[in-house]
């Protein structure tokens, strides 16, 4: 990335992250059966240390989870430098918040996504390449 264009990359990353977070957590809470469509075919999810890869396995995993209600507190994002992902527009998105799964107490969580831009003739769609979810249990 040329330094003169860096602000453009940051603005693009922030817009993409904001749109993505709205779509992702609405889909997770209300249309979970569609959630795996947000992932690349080769994407990997690490959920509290347990890895799940591929859209079919992701779909099965998400369907197993109890219904949820996510509340987002913090969203941070940054473009990933071209040297790390040559010829691929990539964004790191970090989310902190709380979630209540049906039958469980509300818990804090941290989630990190690597998103990549998938261009088609009509538009650009951001897909999840990597997803890492962790419950945050604070020491007392």
UniProtKB/Swiss-Prot annotation:
Q: Where in the cell is it found?
A: Nucleus; Nucleus speckle; Cytoplasm
Name a biological process GO annotation: mRNA export from nucleus
Q: Does the keyword Glycoprotein apply?
A: no
What GO CC annotations are associated with the protein?
Answer: cytoplasm; cytosol; nuclear pore; nuclear pore central transport channel; nuclear RNA export factor complex; nuclear speck; nucleoplasm; nucleus
SUPFAM superfamilies on file: NTF2-like
The answer to keyword Nucleus applying to this record is yes
Quaternary structure (record): Heterodimer with NXF1. Forms a complex with RANGAP1, RANBP2/NUP358 and NXF1. Interacts (via NTF2 domain) with NXF1. Stabilizes the NTF2 domain of NXF1 by heterodimerization. The formation of NXF1-NXT1 heterodimers is required for the NXF1-mediated nuclear mRNA export. Preferentially binds Ran-GTP. Associates with NXF2, NXF3 and NXF5. Does not bind nucleoporins (NPC) directly, its association to NPC is mediated by NXF1.
- Its recorded name reads NTF2-related export protein 1
**What gene is this protein a product of?**
NXT1
């Amino acid at each position: 990335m040329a330094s003169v264009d860096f602000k453009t990359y940051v603005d693009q990353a922030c817009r993409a992250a904001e749109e993505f977070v709205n779509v992702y957590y609405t889909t997770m809470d209300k249309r979970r059966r569609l959630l795996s469509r947000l992932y690349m075919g080769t994407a990997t999810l690490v959920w509290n240390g347990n890895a799940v890869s591929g859209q079919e396995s992701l779909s099965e995993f998400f369907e197993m989870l109890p219904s949820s209600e996510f509340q987002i507190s913090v969203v941070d994002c940054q473009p990933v430098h071209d040297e790390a992902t040559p010829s691929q527009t990539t964004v790191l998105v970090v989310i902190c918040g709380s979630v209540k799964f049906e039958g469980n107490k509300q818990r804090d969580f941290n989630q990190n996504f690597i998103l990549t831009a998938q261009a088609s003739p009509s538009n650009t769609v951001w897909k999840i390449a990597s997803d890492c979810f962790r419950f945050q249990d604070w020491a007392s």
